[in-house]
Design a protein with these regions (language model features):
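Short, surface-exposed beta-edge/turn micro-motifs
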Residues: 7, 104-105, 254
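Sparse recognition of residues in long alpha-helices and their boundaries
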Residues: 16, 96-99, 207
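Compositionally biased alpha-helical segments
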Residues: 1-94, 120, 214, 220
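Conserved beta-strand and immediately adjacent loop positions that scaffold enzyme active sites
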Residues: 9, 106, 190
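Flexible, glycine-rich phosphate/dinucleotide-binding loops
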Residues: 19, 116, 200
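Juxtacatalytic substrate-recognition/specificity segment
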Residues: 51-183
């Protein structure tokens, strides 16, 4: 399926959801409709190499490939499954048209940092991400912050899972087009707006538009720590023009989107 044409190249969507480049001359057009890979086939294709011994769970829209604890897997599944319908409904109520995903949504969960980094080298501070090209959310149960503050680490992890899950949902229901260029503060601020979570024994998604406790706390700390009355304006200016956001930038982007 052609995602976009770029000069003499096409960006093609494969049945497993990945986007890959192809020369226009190497592609033959067909009238057959695009059909995503069946879940069983995709799960089998994913469970090779470092993922060969991982467990598999499937739902209507998701395939979970994991070797984490069952408790962590359950918490992530509850959040992602509840968000899928909730975010979809919220976006439709805003007046946007949505469509059902045409490929299974893949979520890969690693127990250890070493396995996570071996699968894909990434900044050690990143504990979960949505990969725009392969369409997968990848996360790790073990976080560096846990050695310092387990409660805060849990809150950060659950919040990040929801955030990356929102990115995956929006890019698969037609609300955002993969590889499209949006201002960073809008893309990340809207994801934070849709992804607030609770922590403790009842880890769950709070609902789109509810106060994002993690980001509210960060804004409060930052504002109280500053004496300069102009600093808030500077913080906003820096965030809306940034190509890459700091943690404070994420909090500011959420605040701008929420209020």
């Amino acid at each position: 399926k052609v995602h976009v044409a770029v000069g003499e190249y096409l960006i093609v969507k494969l049945p497993d959801g990945q986007l890959v480049p192809r020369k226009s001359d190497d592609v033959n057009a067909t009238e057959r409709p695009f059909v995503g890979m069946p879940m069983d086939d995709l799960a089998r294709e994913l469970r090779v190499g470092p993922l060969a011994e991982f467990k598999v769970k499937k739902s209507k829209h998701y395939i979970y490939i994991y070797n984490t604890s069952e408790a962590f897997n359950r918490a992530a599944v509850v959040i992602l499954e509840s968000m899928f319908n909730g975010v979809n409904t919220y976006v439709r109520n805003m007046g946007a048209k949505t469509t059902a995903p045409d490929v299974p949504l893949v979520v890969i969960m690693f127990k250890s940092r070493s396995e996570y980094q071996e699968y894909f080298r990434i900044d050690p501070s990143i504990i979960a991400y949505y990969h725009i090209l392969n369409n997968r959310v990848v996360m790790c149960e073990e976080t560096p912050l846990a050695r310092v503050d387990q409660a805060l680490a849990d809150q950060q992890l659950i919040s990040t899972i929801a955030h990356e899950g929102v990115h995956q949902i929006l890019h698969n229901i037609g609300a955002q087009s993969r590889m499209s260029a949006w201002p960073m503060w809008i893309t990340e601020g809207f994801a934070e707006y849709l992804a607030p979570t609770t922590v403790g024994n009842n880890r769950r998604w709070k609902g789109a538009g509810q106060v994002n406790d993690m980001r509210m706390m960060e804004l409060e700390v930052q504002i109280k720590a500053r004496d300069n009355a102009n600093w808030t304006g500077d913080m906003i200016s820096e965030s809306v023009t940034a190509r890459q956001l700091t943690s404070v930038g994420y909090a500011t982007s959420w605040g701008l989107t929420h209020y």
